[in-house]
Each structure stands twice: as C-alpha cells, then as structure tokens.
C-alpha cells in the first residue's frame, strides 16, 4: 500500500474480512485486504490458505490483524503485512521484517499517531479495528484526528466506510469496506 499522488482518483479501496466468518469471494477490487484474525482462529488454516491464494491471484496485499486484546502474533507465512495495535511494542518487528507492511491501529491521540508514523508504520487505520461491526469501527473513528493527519502527515491513512462509494470530505488515501 502506498500513497498515490493523483488527487482526482479518490481513495484506494482496502477490503475488510474476518477469518472464519467472511466467505472467500471470487474476486477482489481493492489494493489490500485486512484479514481480522479473531482468537481461536488457528484451526482455520485452510481458510487462511484460501485468502492467501486469492490475494496473490488478485495482486492484493494481505494484511493480518490479530484482533483479540493481547493476542498479537507474528504474521503467518504468505502474507504481506500485519496490523500493530502497539507500534512502540512492535518496533523491533520493523527491523526484523523490513519488507512487511505494518498498519498501525488503536490510535487515540495525535501523539500516538505521530509515534506510530515515526516508528515505521506504513499506514494508519483510524477506527476501531477490533470492533465486531462496521458501525463499531466507524464509532471509533476520530475524524478530526484523521483529517489533521491527511493534511499534515506523509504516512497514508485508512478510514472505515460503509461502501466503496463513500469518500470522506478530508480525502484519506484509503477507505476500508467490509466484504459481504
């Protein structure tokens, strides 16, 4: 995932799915997929392999997110990156996995967001990625913080929205839409 320079294109699409819950579709239209990995999803290896194959076929980055509190794991083999809910704690992973894309999440303040950017996050997710519903994810979005981020910072951000047609006024680089 990278910042694009043509402002007329609008935000790029990031899909959201939950391992073991979301059906694997035939195609993907987005540049990335954030695959939420709930606690106990370890037995879903065949499903994870299906997501890896699909993303590879569709040239779509696969980013995993261990969403259970305190259950962050190393990203599985075959994925392009992972979500960090604590960039301060995960900063060694940036050094250990320099080619992995790291999306920082759980950003309650400007200070924490700036710290995540300074520690090497490739993108920031503004919203509650651990929420079980889109409404919960959106309720956790601090739009003032996200707008400030878009205007001031270079690291791109991701905003959860209901559909690919939604485009927040402050023009984030990426929008995240749950797969049906």
PLM region descriptions:
Residues 53-54, 145-152:
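C-terminal EAL-domain catalytic cores of bacterial cyclic di-GMP phosphodiesterases
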Residues 1-80, 95-108, 114-121, 138, ...:
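Conserved N-terminal beta1-alpha1 strand-loop-helix module at the mouth
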Residues 35, 81-93, 123-137, 164-180:
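Glycine-rich phosphate-binding active-site loops on the catalytic face of alpha/beta enzymes
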Residues 104-106, 127, 145, 154-165:
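Glycine-rich adenosine-cofactor-binding loop
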Residues 100, 132, 141, 151-157:
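Short acidic, glycine/proline-enriched helix-loop-strand junctions
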Residues 140-145, 175:
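Short, glycine-/small-residue-rich phosphate/pyrophosphate-handling segment
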Residues 65, 157-163, 177-179:
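Glycine-rich beta-strand-to-loop/alpha-helix junction loops that act as flexible
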């Amino acid at each position: 995932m990278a910042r694009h320079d043509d402002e007329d294109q609008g935000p790029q699409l990031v899909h959201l799915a939950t391992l073991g819950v979301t059906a694997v579709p035939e195609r993907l239209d987005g540049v990335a997929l954030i695959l939420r990995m709930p606690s106990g999803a370890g037995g879903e290896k065949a499903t994870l392999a299906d997501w890896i194959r699909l993303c590879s076929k569709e040239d779509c980055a696969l980013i995993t997110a261990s969403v259970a509190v305190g259950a962050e794991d190393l990203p599985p083999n075959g994925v392009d990156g992972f979500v960090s809910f604590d960039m301060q704690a995960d900063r060694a992973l940036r050094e250990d996995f320099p080619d992995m894309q790291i999306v920082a999440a759980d950003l309650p303040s400007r200070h924490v967001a700036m710290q995540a950017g300074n520690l090497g996050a490739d993108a920031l997710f503004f919203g509650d990625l651990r929420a079980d519903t889109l409404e919960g994810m959106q309720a956790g979005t601090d739009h003032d913080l996200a707008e400030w981020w878009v205007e001031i910072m270079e690291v791109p951000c991701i905003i959860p929205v209901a559909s690919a047609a939604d485009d927040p006024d402050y023009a984030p680089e990426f929008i995240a839409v749950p797969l049906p």
